Amino acid sequence: MGAEPQGENSRPDRAGVLKGIQGQLADILEIDPESINEGDSFTEDLHLGSIELIELAEAIEDEFDRYTAGFRIEDEDLEDLKTVRDAVDYVVTRL
């Protein structure tokens, strides 16, 4: 479950990025993606530990690499991604 391509490698809009990240989180947490909100904190609301945060970063990289070859979340940037919104904003600005 992830961002739906809107054509051959066309980049998703903000809503598509949100949907993709919600899907990745839902897979990791085994919950309904609709229960994940943009304002949710990864640690306080979704209770992700450090291992799950790394899993999420890798899943996001895999999800969005098809739009921007070599898409990566830098280790130093990962520390600044505290909420779903932070992750969406990060991805949108780098696609």
Residue spans of the language-model regions?
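Phosphopantetheine-dependent thiolation modules in NRPS/PKS and related acyl-activating systems
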Residues: 2-48, 52-55, 62, 66-95
